[in-house]
Amino acid sequence: MASLVDVVGHVNDPGIDVLEVLESMDIVSEFPEKVLEEAERVPDAPTESDLEGRLDLRDEITFTIDGVDAKDLDDAVHIKRLKNGNFELGVHIADVSYYVKEGSELDKEALNRATSVYVTDRVVPMLPERLSNGICSLNPNVDRLTQSAIMEIDAKGRVVKHTITQTVIKTTFRMTYSDVNDIIAGNQEKAEQFKKIVPSIDNMVQLHKILESMRFKRGALNFDTNEAKIMVNKEGRPVDIVLRQRGIAERMIESFMLVANETVAEHFAKLNLPFIYRIHEEPKAEKVQKFIDYASSFGIRIYGTALSLIHISEPTRPYS
């Protein structure tokens, strides 16, 4: 016999359809009371003792770049040119593990949720907002604890030196992708507003182009697709669908996160330590064969296997 478990809301409540979907997937917005109580015991700011043993980067010009709607600012960057002409790039990630201890109620809840869930009009966070939007968010002009990959990169895009360490930073600005894209496009008003970091943005553009060029030479593919965003009104009803345009700012951050991820992965691989890697597995033979058959219909002959593809383009007609 069926019984009432919970009342989600009235059918006409704003956003009730989204809440229904979340409930049907066992994605719970509310946190258990014991998790919230533990979150309340987390301080609002680091203490002096928290900073001990950490590399102090608060004097570096460091800033975040995110979407305009972002609230949990979990990564930041700094960049400068060294005397030898190389770039120093720092990628800083909020040190959540300093506050969320293994086996704690916060840790168990985060393990159960696995990730933050982004839907049309809201975010269901992995951690309570006191942490995700507070001390674990790299908000401007406040001290924040971070894990950092600091890399020296030469003019060919090679990481010649790196340091991976615990740090303390203080971001200068909370930048949006549109702000940075405007500055790159020559918007003088934005350049004046954020003049302190304009030299950093110039360096970012230069380094991004170097890193992107190196990736393409290594055989990387550019899947630069536009993402749709559903616009809703105050009642939570969809009113429009717009395309998120990816500018150079978005691609720069992507380049910097990629080089940081590669550097960290290589670092721990050389140490032969247990580590979690995200890799692209070799394609299945039947999928490769389907692709070869499909490509041949366009006059392109492909030689190789799933282990090593060597392709020679021989189109029967010119392509642009």
Positions of the model-derived regions?
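OB-fold/S1-family single-stranded nucleic acid-binding modules
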Residues: M1-D13
